[in-house]
Amino acid sequence: MSEQPESGKAAESAHSAARRAPSGGDVLDNIYRLDAPLGKGGVGVVFKAWHLHLQRPCAIKFLHPQLVSNPELRTRFRREAQSAFQLGHPHIVAITDFRDDPSNWPYLVMELVQGESLRDRLEKGPLDPPLAVRLMSELADALVAAHRRGVIHRDLKPENLLLGTVDKPGPGEPDVHLKVLDFGLSKMLDGVEITGSGRLVGSPSYMSPEQARGDSHIVDARSDIWSVGVLLYECLTADKLFSCENFEQKRQQIIGATLPPLHFTEKGLPPLIEKIITRCCQRVP
């Protein structure tokens, strides 16, 4: 039996990759080669990848396996990718490409941020106050730019905030900058049931009261601002502002409980920081 030509093997490999979940070694559209997976979440799975033509690394997000067969969600995935692409902000992870061949898995291509997530950093302990304030200021700058374009994140959390390292910072310049991941993508899951049991959009510890109530129709930029206050508290303490382990108790705490005492003055932190957190997490009666 004659051996199959290399071109035939490549075509067969590409066709096989289209039928199964993406994995390391796959080549997409003769442009991107997948390497190791970087992580997964409610929207999809992310791989480190290599741009074969430009010879540079990138990151690729695929739609979640349980969502890929839903035509409506594929359309929403494309729409949200387009929204995120338009943002173009130094503190928002850049979207550089989007592909959606009906016979394949839809995916978007992002810049690869070298560094660690805020979650990884907080596992080592609280941040120094100047660093915490600077990172949250960079987050606020990104939010202002996005909100002006009508794009709301809705799922801000330490896992979605990357601390990108600066190769050669100048004198007095910081060696890390914050980059926001998944801008615009969390909205696409609004009202979607992945597990068959209803699903709240947002991470429990960081969701706003309206998200905790399930009032997705009134979620707006203020929900992101609430999350900034919760994140600033955690940056300074390495503890969650709403610490109940039970989901329902935490939800009720977010919806209506009095904001826990911050005691920042006792910890030697400026009173202004406490005022900022209190203002961000102010409930509307």
Question: Which residue stretches match the model-derived regions?
Answer:
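Activation segment of protein kinases
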Residues: 19, 69-72, 165-217, 245
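Protein kinase glycine-rich loop
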Residues: 35-42, 46
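Conserved N-lobe loop of protein kinases adjacent to the ATP-binding glycine-rich P-loop
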Residues: 50-57
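AlphaC helix of the eukaryotic protein kinase fold
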Residues: 64-86
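Hydrophobic/aromatic scaffold residues of ePK-like serine/threonine protein kinase catalytic domains
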Residues: 86, 135-136
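Activation-segment/catalytic-loop signature of the eukaryotic protein kinase fold
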Residues: 98
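Conserved short submotifs of the Hanks-type protein kinase catalytic core
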Residues: 103-117, 121
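C-terminal lobe helix-coil module of Hanks-type protein kinase domains
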Residues: 137, 143-144, 159-162, 203-285
